[in-house]
Each structure stands twice: as structure tokens, then as C-alpha cells.
């Protein structure tokens, strides 16, 4: 199985496009991570909007550059709003991304996410256990935590990509991005990133934004993984622990955008 690597030039080009286009991202995400997700998008130059009311969500999905569906704090009313937004995004050809949080551990959200797959997401981002569960390979995971290595989920991710037409992102010590034919691996990051709530969810929002960019969508999404890992490495070098990591991480994202504009 061939796994390609992303070049720094590809990553820099995608970040330049990101800053240039400043996607408006409709984030229907979980309650725990909304502020961090919004700040991550802002630091990179995107515009976040957290619209969750059913009538508003359906309308906003038509005008946003991209839509994120994150089921981390799923409720029945929220599921209805998400379904309405996805249906409108499909009609309006708005790219949308699914983050199937804890789908391997909880049956209600697994059924809901499987239903959403019929609307053909542009991208799917999850950890190894989530991707394997969504692909029907195995149930598992410890809530939002993975119990599988990312590399073990590559075959499931490739199958899921081929079946849905989505670009699938499996995150872990190494991130893997695949469209079912090409697979790109992104190294880097730091274990401390797993001790801060929302780094994966924020990545899903950046992935959603990248789906709205021109050019090679797989490379743009792989670049999103690279930016987050780069920023994580820089932040860890300046941090004393999870508490001081977050502001340094946001600063590092901002600095990355400034460097590609120089």
C-alpha cells in the first residue's frame, strides 16, 4: 500500500489559498469546542458561524462556503437541525464535512451518521476507531478516544471513501488522508495535543473550510492536517502544559498564515 507525503510547498500553497479565499464555515459542532473551533478558524483567516436553529441552519447552509457536522453533543433537536442543513447543503452544492465523534461507542449517533452518508459528504474526519466503526469494520473506541492506531484504519478509510465519494481523514500520531485511491500521510504534532479538548474537532472545521478551496481537495485537506501539526509542535515548544498550550497554538496558526503572506 503506497502512502505519499505532502510537500512543504503544497502545504504553503494551500495555506495561501485559504487566507486568500477566507471561507465562511457553518459550524454545527459540539458545545464543548465551539470557542476553540471558532478561534482556530479565525487564526487561519477563515470566518466561523455557529448557527444551530433548524430554520436558520437550513438557510445558512445555502450561503456558507462550507458546512461542518460534528455530532459530539448530539440531541434529537440538534440532529433535526443538522439533517436540514445537510439536505440544503446538498441542494446548494455546499461542501460539507462529517465528524462522527464517538460513533463507535454509541448506537444512536452511529445510526444518525450512517443516514447522513446518503447525502454524500465531501469529507469525513475522525480517529481510527470512529472511521472503522463508520465503515462497518468494527465497533470500538472509548467515547471520544480511539483504541486503534491510525494506520490500522487505512483500509477502512479507503473503502469508506470509495463507497461515499468523500475524502476520509484518519487522525492520530500520523494523519492519513485518502480518496480511496490516493493516500497521503502527514507526520508531526505532539502527544500534548491529545490533552487539550477540541484539537480534533477544530481540525474538522479547518478540513471543512479546505473543501471550499479551489484546486486539489485532497492536497488541501492534507495541508490542513499539516498546519495543525506544525502549530502544535511550535506551541508545545513554548508551553508548560495544556493550559498554556492553547494560546500558543492559536498564535502559531496565526504566525503560519503571516509567513506564507511574506
Swiss-Prot record:
Domain of life where this protein originates: Bacteria
Enzyme Commission number(s): 2.7.1.50
Alphabetical GO biological process terms: thiamine biosynthetic process; thiamine diphosphate biosynthetic process
Pfam families: HK (PF02110)
GO terms, molecular function: ATP binding; hydroxyethylthiazole kinase activity; magnesium ion binding
Pathway named in the protein's UniProt entry: Cofactor biosynthesis; thiamine diphosphate biosynthesis; 4-methyl-5-(2-phosphoethyl)-thiazole from 5-(2-hydroxyethyl)-4-methylthiazole: step 1/1
Binding, ATP: 125, 171
Keywords for this protein: ATP-binding, Kinase, Magnesium, Metal-binding, Nucleotide-binding, Thiamine biosynthesis, Transferase
Record-listed substrate binding positions: 50, 198
SUPFAM superfamilies in the cross-refs: Ribokinase-like (SSF53613)
Catalyzed reaction equations: 5-(2-hydroxyethyl)-4-methylthiazole + ATP = 4-methyl-5-(2-phosphooxyethyl)-thiazole + ADP + H(+)
CDD domains per the UniProt record, alphabetical: THZ_kinase
Enzyme class: transferase
Cofactor(s) of this protein: Mg(2+)
HAMAP family named among the record's database cross-references: Thz_kinase
Physiological role: Catalyzes the phosphorylation of the hydroxyl group of 4-methyl-5-beta-hydroxyethylthiazole (THZ).
Record family assignment: Belongs to the Thz kinase family.
Name assigned to this protein: Hydroxyethylthiazole kinase
Native source organism of the sequence: Escherichia coli O6:K15:H31 (strain 536 / UPEC)
Gene (name only): thiM
Amino acid at each position: 500500500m503506497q502512502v505519499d507525503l505532502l510537500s512543504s510547498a503544497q502545504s504553503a500553497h494551500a495555506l495561501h489559498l485559504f487566507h486568500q479565499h477566507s471561507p465562511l464555515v457553518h459550524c454545527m459542532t459540539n458545545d464543548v469546542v465551539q470557542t476553540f473551533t471558532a478561534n482556530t478558524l479565525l487564526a487561519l483567516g477563515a470566518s466561523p458561524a455557529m448557527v444551530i436553529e433548524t430554520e436558520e441552519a437550513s438557510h445558512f447552509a445555502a450561503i456558507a462556503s462550507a458546512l461542518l457536522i460534528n455530532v459530539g453533543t448530539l440531541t434529537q433537536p440538534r440532529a433535526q437541525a443538522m439533517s436540514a442543513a445537510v439536505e440544503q447543503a446538498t441542494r446548494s452544492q455546499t461542501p460539507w464535512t462529517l465528524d462522527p465523534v464517538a460513533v463507535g461507542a454509541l448506537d444512536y449517533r452511529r445510526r444518525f451518521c450512517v443516514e447522513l452518508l446518503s447525502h454524500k459528504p465531501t469529507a469525513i474526519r475522525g480517529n481510527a476507531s470512529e472511521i472503522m466503526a463508520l465503515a462497518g469494520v468494527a465497533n470500538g473506541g472509548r467515547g471520544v478516544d480511539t483504541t486503534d492506531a491510525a494506520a490500522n484504519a487505512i483500509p477502512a478509510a479507503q473503502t469508506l471513501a470509495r463507497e461515499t465519494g468523500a475524502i476520509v481523514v484518519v487522525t492520530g500520531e500520523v494523519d492519513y488522508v485518502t480518496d480511496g485511491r490516493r493516500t497521503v500521510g502527514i507526520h508531526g504534532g505532539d502527544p500534548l495535543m491529545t490533552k487539550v479538548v477540541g484539537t480534533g474537532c477544530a481540525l474538522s472545521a479547518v478540513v471543512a473550510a479546505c473543501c471550499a478551496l479551489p484546486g486539489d481537495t485532497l492536497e488541501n485537506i492534507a495541508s490542513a492536517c499539516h498546519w495543525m501539526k506544525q502549530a502544535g509542535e511550535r506551541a508545545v515548544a513554548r508551553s508548560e502544559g495544556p493550559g498554556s498550550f492553547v494560546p500558543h497554538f492559536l498564535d502559531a496558526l496565526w504566525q503560519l498564515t503571516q509567513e506564507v503572506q511574506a
